[in-house]
Amino acid sequence: MKKLTNVFWGSGFLVLLAVLFGAFLPEQFETFTNHIQKFLTSNFGWYYLIVVAIIIIFCLFLVLSPIGSIRLGKPGEEPGYSNKSWFAMLFSAGMGIGLVFWGAAEPLSHYAVQAPGGEVGTQAAMKDALRYSFFHWGISAWSIYAIVALALAYFKFRKNAPGLISATLYPILGKHAKGPIGQLIDIIAVFATVIGVATTLGLGAQQINGGLTYLFGVPNNFTVQFTIIVIVTILFMLSAMSGLDKGIQLLSNVNIYVAGVLLVLTLILGPTLFIMNNFTNSFGDYLQNIIQMSFQTAPDAPDARKWIDSWTIFYWAWWLSWSPFVGIFIARISRGRTIRQFLLGVIVLPALVSVFWFAVFGGSAIFVEQHGNSGLSSLATEQVLFGVFNEFPGGMMLSIVAMILIAVFFITSADSATFVLGMQTTGGSLNPPNSVKVTWGLLQAGIASVLLYAGGLTALQNASIIAAFPFSIVIILMIVSLFVSLTREQEKLGLYVRPKKSQRSQL
């Protein structure tokens, strides 16, 4: 068995501390973490916006630069997974259950509850609702994941470094990357991963329970949610023990097929013309305003500033907190692709799918609110999707497909997380032992269950977002480190705007 590292014990201690606070002092812990989170979003919102903008610009630079032809692996090495399986796995890990949870609920909230641009229920509010949903789940989120994944994949497969966050900083930290500073960085990454995934497990259990309640009258309580977590835990641990090539790959492919079926059925059975017209209009609006939205802080408009802090800054912090987990997993499955192929595959295609997903489900929710069930916006977040389906022909069938999708996404996210946590706490092993994966799987399930029971899930989510602040500094250092190493290799390989044939063969 691989030896457990100081990162395991250090991160385990922090997680235990957070869980104990959440379990025994849930209200105080929520107040404490909420205060810190609001302080960070209110005072450092500008910082989060600039960090994400830097990430996007750097990714664009790499795609357009000759550096983009460098391969993440040995010269001429082929990818280990087909394009379909690669996309399925990275997409399932990166968004997963969040798309189902927020696909209808977020645009509806922007339209009917709190519009980003002013008065709710207006045509302008509808356009803004979709535009901002595209913005929150589009290229910005995927660029954050991509840059962390790229740094890890490059240093692991090109430089043969350990698969650890700290190992990506060796060019600028030197020996300190292997010492206490490097271990602290890895501990923050593991803490953010454990807390973020445990929160998602809790939210997933709530959404499945909410769907069962809405559809079949099943009680909405902790007993049902705990039963859901137990069943899902057994399934994802069986998948985790079967290995990456069997369990996660198979489940991810199933995810994509089921998600595709649900998307197409909703588009056909729902208000198709309304969806496509508003998708086209709002997508153009998104492209036209993406730069302005990326830097908007609204310093002279208190209401708009509050909305930006609550949504955009919250999302940027959330994606940053999830980037260690998703980045490590994407890096693990991306060997053999060029930097350009990697970035286009991780950013552009997932962003387009996410955008269209919100157009279909968010557009459907807004249509129902306008023309059918005007009380849709008063439903709990986890029930909005099922409320939308209830207004469509074949609504029960759609709801059942959605429940299956939530469950499979649920299993895949937890499965991927146990794999990543196993890697991070065994020195970056690409194939961590089952015993370590099972340990992390049980811990995640236990954390989610305890905090669902105690009511401390929101506080745990706040803690994860707080961890995003120090990790954002790590990401900036990763960009600098990656740039330093790539420019050195560019000079070594003689890469220019038009490399010669002989030079391409060296990549």
From Swiss-Prot:
The alphabetical list of record keywords is: Amino-acid transport, Cell membrane, Membrane, Stress response, Transmembrane, Transmembrane helix, Transport
- Bilayer disposition of the protein: Multi-pass membrane protein
Q: What happens when the gene is disrupted?
A: Mutants show a strong decrease in the rate of glycine betaine uptake. Mutation does not significantly affect cryoprotection or virulence of the organism, probably due to the presence of other glycine betaine/carnitine transporters in the cell.
> Which residues does UniProt assign to the signal peptide?
none
| Induction profile | Constitutively expressed. Up-regulated in response to salt stress and cold shock.
Please give the Gene Ontology molecular function terms for this protein: amino-acid betaine transmembrane transporter activity
Q: Which GO terms of type biological process are on file?
A: amino acid transport; glycine betaine transport; response to cold; response to osmotic stress
The domain of life is Bacteria
Q: How is this protein's activity kept under control?
A: Activated rapidly in response to an osmotic upshift.
Known PANTHER family for this protein?
HIGH-AFFINITY CHOLINE TRANSPORT PROTEIN, HIGH-AFFINITY CHOLINE TRANSPORT PROTEIN-RELATED
**Something else known:** Activation of preexisting BetL protein in response to relatively low salt concentrations represents the most immediate response of the cell to increased salinity. GbuABC system is most important during prolonged exposure.
What family does the entry list?
Answer: Belongs to the BCCT transporter (TC 2.A.15) family.
* Name listed for the protein in its UniProt record: Glycine betaine transporter BetL
Q: What is the lineage of its organism?
A: Bacteria, Bacillati, Bacillota, Bacilli, Bacillales
Tell me what gene encodes this: betL
